């Protein structure tokens, strides 16, 4: 970043801060404004070491809740505005990663056109959007943010500052009086709508544009013209992921698929309207094909003003038909009483594409390639990418639930021999029975049995309803609308076969069943489970019919919670090594999906780096990665940033597939070092979470319970009503630690692991061990990514604040003991990182991030201080609505400021 750009960021933040201050003074009075300013000055003193965090706490100790709420809102809004400035700054700096640079690298390193084309033709790259409890901002807030961002752009380009500041004042006045978050717990429908918001903001335009750019890059770099392709096709979990979420049902799945279909159909109508206006070609000056003329004649548009404009007439008819698609998707109450359309809706995207191709061929046959390559090409690419379904909605449920459903269905069909219950069978017996059923063409139950009321328990009825709704979605919107059924906590072969039986029962044999390995033990056993699965001729033939492709998902969140940061990262990498080798041995293509969260403790970090950090052979052109929460907002909230992130995604996949991205001199030694480090780190992590006082410390020193109580997201915080860490969902686990600025899931245990690894040899040999670690950091993308992501999350931690959160624990002995463990390990890890990397600070390698953290730090402190004070009040019995609501404001403010907090 140049000094000029850095200065501009600083000036933009000051401008927005000044206008926000003016709004607060006007709306809430000078006293509140001065309170906010006094808080800000004290926070700066704390950040510069001129005051202690306790001094900041004093401001709020006896402050009434109304004023406390206003201060919390002020700093939360400022975090939101600071994000706008930094996002705008990011757009002005050339991206480190781009398709252009990647294709140049492929050419430079000797990749052939044939190899590149082979990977691209079979590639499937998918960002999969998922819900997140702190991403509940309303459309009004997003729209206001967008307008303020545009005003900043106007200021950068010489706009009238008086006019700009006045509109900023207007927009911020509206923003200040608009609730950032909903009062009620968001429904699944709310979360589905939030996910679709990003399609309207960026993805509808940018994903097809990216797919066209890949074709263009192939032509420009390798001289090879590829047909219309969709390397990237987005996915979603919102409305189909019912693992631990009792609110997902047939209705929400139907809502998700229909809203997605409506979104893309409306987009096509809008784009066809623009195309109709643009294709003003008159047959007095241009010619058209006979098939185009036939399309025009069939359009029903016989307006005298258009008698010489066959292209417009043709598009008019297409738009009328697509409008019928939209009408058919509207709810009955919205179309009741309206005159039904005379136009027949398009039955399939292929039918729609055929009409678009008629226009394309006609234009190109008459020297109008330049016209064909504009909006028409964009629409054709969108149809190739999105079809009529927009995104692929995944079904996800845990293996235990699938087994319970199978038990009831088999009991109803009397399919278990000897009068036994299915759950009483040995694993081998289960597998034999399941395969028998999968090979039997007849259904398990009589037609309509799945829809009979009270035929099954409420849980099983709901689960079967989801499968029936999925089958209806496929009939309505095509096979890509529901393409994956993911089994959480996969531990056996029967876990994979059980949902296959349910899918067969509802006619969804083509849906891919995807085992999700997520605990440390399951990751270690993943390859063995698949080896056993493939040993069954039925399943091997099943794979052969699918092109010998096996999709597997790896879970970053639960593995981290299970074994700690370093052990989880190595378990994932080692699992991939085993899967790659197994697939090579059996001549099967491996397609990996990665269940990553926004936070480093849930597998977060730069997507490009994460993809390149995979073992050789683990990508092969295809990769699916979940995206969520604040990360979605940061990546896809604007077209410019969306394009950057999408290009980085695809660039990583292409480079990992076609280049040697793992140049380790001695892989066996590198893997042995990682096994040692992972083992040592896991032991240290277990010492922490196994401490008798750990549960008390965790639940009382973080806002865990408040996350569950304060309407943050539609999903419950835990899978079961227990205090076990294993039953806690990963998002509240990571979010709780990030709120207390401890961030344990992103670093704990690494320092002890490095210390034990180095000290395991005589003192004279220890420098050579340090050098081994330095060499790995310099040459191995995986190790470098693990260490860099760790440094990022440590830089966002603040251990002095964690001490204040520890004071919330009832038992001071437990508080002191656990905090001392955490503080000691943090310092040990910090020193280890600096020694390995040679850096002077945790963020030395990323000066942009260093400046960002420095700017944000004084605005994070007040939010933590307010949260600490209000947690004391809330837990002490102060159940005023404004107390709980202000805690929620601080949570969202901190998550907004930290950006990848959960």
Curated annotation (Swiss-Prot):
GO terms for molecular function: magnesium ion binding; phosphoenolpyruvate carboxylase activity. Disulfide bonds: none annotated. The keyword Magnesium applies. Residues 327-346 are annotated as: Disordered. Pfam families: PEPcase. It is an enzyme of class 4 (lyase). The active site is at 132, 561. Gene3D superfamilies: Phosphoenolpyruvate/pyruvate domain. Keywords: Carbon dioxide fixation, Lyase, Magnesium. It catalyses: oxaloacetate + phosphate = phosphoenolpyruvate + hydrogencarbonate. It comes from the Bacteria. GO terms for cellular component: cytosol. Its cofactor is Mg(2+). Its EC number is 4.1.1.31. InterPro entries: PEP_COase, PEP_COase_bac/pln-type, PEP_COase_Lys_AS, PEPCASE_His_AS, Pyrv/PenolPyrv_kinase-like_dom. One of its GO terms (biological process) is tricarboxylic acid cycle. Belongs to the PEPCase type 1 family. Forms oxaloacetate, a four-carbon dicarboxylic acid source for the tricarboxylic acid cycle. NCBIfam families: PRK00009.1 (NF000584). This is Phosphoenolpyruvate carboxylase. It comes from Corynebacterium diphtheriae (strain ATCC 700971 / NCTC 13129 / Biotype gravis).
